[in-house]
């Protein structure tokens, strides 16, 4: 019986040793993935920052030359302003992304009329759009009260609409809102633009994934949209079957028990 006891102890210790080795290997792989992700992030950040910084440096130097005419001076100033705004957006996007990932971004939930918010967003996008496409809002609803962070919800809608304007020179861009079920609202942004290739759709919400490498942007916008929507209790996706452009959809919960409630998370 003593021999059987020792055999049992040895088997149990061997099992624990194997489990410990497996756990150590898992931790090692997680650490390696974390290092790779951080290195890729820093590499992409360096590339994205370098482009506007080079423009700021180069065109600022041109402005110091006394021989340039007023038209050239104006063009240089415009380029400097555009790249300053791009650099600021990149910094803000990185701050937002980091805050969301570590749970440091504060969400202030209060009752908001989603229909009114959508109309305000359309008005804002109409004023800043750089396209001939019509920007529209469509809904069968007179109003729809949501317990949400209106600023963050607005941020997502503006991001999706501005993305659509970059790839829709003609035609239309439509923001639609409907009540999908008793407890779920469905938002969608549909455009008649160039669309998104199937191979890109699967990784469209990845960091630094750009729809067009030649277009200005940080490549972080859709990642931020996804994280915000998840914090609001919904989910976001691209419609793989829509072929006349692109269509992004996301859900938002309607919680009747929370009517009249305000909170910070």
Residue ranges and their predicted role:
Residues 29, 82-87:
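Short alpha-helical segment of the dimerization/phosphotransfer core of two-component systems
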Residues 221, 225:
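Short alpha-helical Gxxx[C/S/T] motif in the catalytic ATP-binding
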Residues 196-208:
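Short conserved segment of the HATPase_c
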Residues 23-65:
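Primarily the dimerization/phosphotransfer
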Residues 98-109:
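Helix-loop junction within the histidine kinase core
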